[in-house]
Structure formats: structure tokens, C-alpha cells
A protein has these predicted regions:
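Conserved, well-structured core segments that form the ligand-binding/active-site neighborhood
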Residues: 34, 40, 178-354
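Extended hydrophobic packing segments that form well-structured cores
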Residues: 404-507
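Gly/Ser/Thr-rich loops at beta-strand to alpha-helix junctions
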Residues: 80-82, 125-129, 148-158, 173-181, ...
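Bacterial signal peptide processing site
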Residues: 46-47
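Metallocofactor- and cofactor-centric catalytic cores in central/energy metabolism, strongly enriched
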Residues: 50-156, 160-176, 210-211, 240-259, ...
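N-terminal export leaders
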Residues: 25-43
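C-terminal catalytic subdomain
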Residues: 332-437
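N-terminal secretory signal peptides
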Residues: 1-25
Length: 507
């Protein structure tokens, strides 16, 4: 351990005072960045990422290239009665053709935004013969999903027939085409998702479900642990195990390159403050990030989880991978802790289904306040979304608390905002709960990991009854969206019990 690390104290957060090229910014650089930011905002550019990038050398690996982008194909069709209408909802006054055109365009636009190909059927289904022919077409072409839009409340039978084709089915019923009785029979069927709404974002989220499932299927998770090389599966995700020494060796041959200097500079310069980490820590953390990218490329994988504590406890590497893992999460590429496969799959779920990073954590009960503290040393900063225009959460650079080595992000989560907790505890089953951010805990005075978020749980009377370990927390109340995904793809959902002694609640 270096003298820098040995001299660290347990005093409260203060910015270190030594000059450090990896975490300082000159006045000229600051003014240039500010001008670029103003230009970006006034011209409405698609991404603010350019503020922090530089020309990449041929040797550098684009982190975003690991995020799977499989082809996703959805067949879309209108189901209705033969017009003109006389009585019956949506009503004779309803502008049938203009609404058909508007929603058709909205569905196409939603698909384009998230990378889903929409194949629109040319004519609406208005009789039994057309329905039967379309069902045969679906069974023959086997798209990833079918989206059925209803334009009459007597067309629910058509939706049911299409759902029997054996392909995941999204039913969109604009308000005015369904009563509760229409929806109830189909809405809770496995493999089906029913939207009764005027909200276009609900259609886009349904298409994200289809895309997320394909992304999980396309993901190969690198598990860096143990001494053997083998393959496996966890639900939809393929697994590639490699010996832990593979990463240790990769780190040892990764130099302090220009990329490493830039990565350290960027992460340090955007921090609210820097407490324990030194310049050397920043460069080693950047080397770990680059080594992880190279290992992923060498193994042909899309995500990884490493035996990070084993490497650090045995002093095989001089830094935990926390800073690099946080950067991975910010680019939509999963980097899980402790070679834990289920939590890594949970991180993928939030990233693929909602385009925002999750926070894998240890659950700590705070019994005086009756809140759960979600605590770990890796959190992404783009918790509002992977879109680079969205502001990242403020963060403080700290050491990894258990070892007092390296660089970890203490991300400050927004108090008062809702959050969702998910964890695959089996390949086909997950825990699902929600809550609200109540505060951020500093270390010290607390012990434990650097990002520690207080969560006041919904529908759980006692924080000690929250189920799971290494749950993944992400911003927003997405309970219904997660339940919809699980219903579509046959995943069992379990909620923590409301009161102590009650059994866990299935969704």
C-alpha cells in the first residue's frame, strides 16, 4: 500500500489540496467548455457527449459498442369493424381515418426512436377472413411481437385471436374502445400486454419491452471469477466464465495511455469534490476501465461482473474497479460487482428496459427512521437516463471504503424522487418493490459503502422485511412497467410482505 493510502484519515469530506492534472481545469478550458455548452443548448444538438470527447486513436475501444443492438421486428395492425360506424364506441363522430393515420405515424416514430422495426399491415382487419389470414402470416413470419391497435370496442375478439398465434402481443386500445370488462379477460394473460390509454409514451415503453427481451438474448455476460473457463446460461443471458487471473494479467499490461489520462481527467473534473483519491489512484482506476474494455473485446462479450473483492483483498491489483464500473453503467453497459450473476442480469434489465443505469447494492435497515439504506461503492451517475443531454447526478470521488483504495463514486440521489428495486433471485423470478429517496448517508459517520441512499419503502411497514440482497435500485416508480415485462415473458414477480410475518406477495 502506498504512503498516500496509509496516511488517509477518517475525517469528513474535503477536496485534496495537491496539484493534479487529472482533476484540474484551467480557466481557458473552463470558458471553452462553457461556450461549447451554450452552443449545444442553443442549437439543440442531439448529444452533449462532444463536450467531453476527443479524437479517439485507432487502439481505443468505444465503450458504447458493447451494448447489444439486435434486430427487433414488430408487426403492427389495426383491428376494427367495417365503417361507417353507427352508434357503439368510439362513436359515429369519431374521426376514424385521421386517428388511424395519426397513431400509425406515432407507432412508427416510437419504433424509430428506440431501434425497433415496425412492419405495418396495409389494411385494417375488418372481417373474420382477414383476421385468419393475418394470424397465419404471424405464425409464418414469427416477428418478435405483434402490436394490435383497436378502433372499435367490438374488436376485442380479434385481439384475442391474434394473441393465440403464439407471439408476444401488445394490444393498444385508445380511450373510447374499451370498458373494464373488455380489458379484464385479456389483460392478465401471459404473453400479452394491454394498453387502454391515449398516452403515446405507453406504446414506446411497450416496444422497449420487446427490445429489452431481445437485448437480454443477445447479451453474453463475462463472469471473471475462479480458475476455470466455462459457459452457462442465466435465463435469457449467455454466460462466459474466465479465470480471475485473466483480468489481473490484463490490468498489469495496460499502460498509462493518453486515454487513461483523459478518462481520469474527465471523471475528476466533473466531480463535486474529491476526497481521498490521488492522481495515481485516478490513473490506476482509468487503467482498470480500459483493461475491462479490452477483456470484453477479447472474449466477445457485452457485459461483465468480476470478483472485485477477491482481487483487492489478495492485493492482485492496486485499485478496485469502482470508477470504471460507474462509467460502464453510464454508457448502458453492465459492469456488476462480486461476480454475482443475478444482480448483473438485474442491472441489464433496468438498462435495457428503461435506458437508465441501476445501482446494485447491499440492503441496510435503518430502524430509527424505518428506511432502507441501499449501499455500495458503484453507482452510475446518469441515473436520469442514458441520453447524454440529461444532467448527471452530482457525485463525490471517494476511495473504495472497505479497502480505502482507488476511486469510488459517491452519487447523491435526488431526495423526494421515486425509485424501483428489482432483483432476479432465480432466472425466471424477481423481487420487485418501490419507494422514495429519503436522503443520502455520508461515510463517515456511517460505515459501509460510499453511495448510501435512504429509501422510504412503499407498502412495507418495516424496513427489515425488504426481500433480497444485491437488489438493483433505479430512478422512477416503474412497478407496473416491470410487471408488464414479466407477464409478457413468463417471469414470476414477488413483492416484499406488507407486514412482518406475512408471506411474500406474488404480483
Amino acid at each position: 500500500m502506498s504512503s498516500n493510502h496509509q496516511s488517509r484519515s477518517n475525517e469528513g469530506p474535503t477536496v485534496h489540496g495537491h496539484p493534479c492534472s487529472c482533476c484540474s481545469m484551467s480557466r481557458r478550458s473552463f470558458l471553452g467548455a462553457a461556450a461549447a455548452c451554450t452552443a449545444a443548448l442553443t442549437t439543440g444538438c442531439a448529444s452533449l457527449q462532444s463536450l467531453h470527447t476527443r479524437p479517439r486513436s485507432n487502439e481505443e475501444i468505444d465503450i458504447a459498442s458493447f451494448r447489444p443492438r439486435p434486430q427487433v421486428r414488430v408487426m403492427s395492425v389495426i383491428a376494427r369493424q367495417k365503417p361507417p360506424y353507427w352508434l357503439g364506441w368510439p362513436g359515429t363522430a369519431y374521426p376514424l381515418e385521421s386517428e388511424r393515420a395519426r397513431y400509425t405515424q406515432a407507432i412508427a416514430d416510437a419504433g424509430r426512436r428506440i431501434g425497433v422495426e415496425i412492419v405495418q399491415e396495409g389494411e385494417p382487419l375488418e372481417d373474420k377472413e382477414a383476421v385468419a389470414a393475418f394470424v397465419k402470416k404471424v405464425q409464418s413470419e414469427k416477428p418478435d411481437a405483434v402490436l394490435v391497435m383497436l378502433q372499435h370496442f367490438q374488436s376485442w375478439g380479434t385481439a384475442g385471436e391474434i394473441a393465440k398465434a403464439g407471439v408476444p402481443t401488445i394490444v393498444f386500445a385508445p380511450v373510447g374502445t374499451a370498458f373494464t370488462g373488455h380489458v379484464n379477460g385479456l389483460a392478465f394473460r401471459s404473453g400479452v400486454h394491454v394498453i387502454s390509454s391515449l398516452e403515446i409514451p405507453a406504446i414506446e415503453q411497450a416496444l422497449r419491452m420487446v427490445r429489452a427481451k431481445r437485448q437480454l438474448e443477445a447479451t453474453k455476460l463475462l463472469v471473471v471469477s475462479g480458475n476455470e473457463r466455462k459457459e452457462g446460461k442465466f435465463g435469457l443471458v449467455s454466460l462466459q466464465y474466465v479465470p480471475r487471473a485473466t483480468f489481473e494479467e490484463m490490468f498489469s499490461v495496460t499502460p498509462v495511455s493518453e486515454e487513461a489520462k483523459w478518462v481520469a481527467h474527465q471523471r475528476f473534473s466533473e466531480a463535486r469534490k474529491v476526497v481521498e483519491p490521488t492522481k495515481e489512484d485516478g490513473l490506476n482506476a482509468a487503467r482498470s476501465y480500459i483493461a475491462a474494455k479490452q477483456l470484453l473485446k477479447n472474449e466477445g462479450c457485452n457485459a461483465l461482473t468480476t470478483d472485485c473483492l477477491g482481487m483487492v483483498s489478495q492485493k492482485k491489483v492496486p485499485t478496485p474497479p469502482c470508477m470504471g464500473a460507474s462509467i460502464f453503467q453510464d454508457y448502458g453497459v453492465t459492469y456488476g460487482c462480486e461476480a454475482a450473476v443475478g444482480p448483473a442480469a438485474s442491472l441489464m434489465l433496468t438498462s435495457y428496459l428503461f435506458d437508465r443505469p441501476g445501482f446494485m447494492n447491499d440492503p441496510v435497515p435503518e430502524t430509527a427512521k424505518n428506511v432502507l439504506i441501499a449501499s455500495h461503492c458503484v453507482s452510475g451517475t446518469r441515473i436520469y437516463g442514458l441520453d447524454r443531454q440529461k444532467e448527471h447526478a452530482p457525485y463525490i470521488l471517494r476511495s473504495h471504503s472497505e479497502s480505502n483504495l482507488g476511486v469510488s463514486t459517491q452519487v447523491l440521489w435526488p431526495v423526494g424522487q421515486p425509485v424501483t428495486l428489482v432483483q432476479f433471485f432465480k432466472p425466471d423470478a424477481l423481487y420487485l418493490d418501490t419507494g422514495t429517496v429519503a436522503g443520502n448517508v455520508n461515510t463517515p459517520p456511517a460505515g459501509g459503502c460510499r453511495t448510501s441512499v435512504e429509501i422510504r419503502m412503499d407498502d412495507i411497514e418495516d424496513c427489515r422485511d425488504v426481500l433480497g440482497f444485491h437488489q438493483v435500485v433505479f430512478l422512477g416508480n416503474h412497478r407496473r412497467d416491470v410487471e408488464a415485462f414479466c407477464q409478457m415473458y413468463g417471469i414470476n414477480v414477488v413483492h416484499s410482505p406488507r407486514a412482518h410475518g406475512e408471506t411474500a406477495k406474488p404480483a
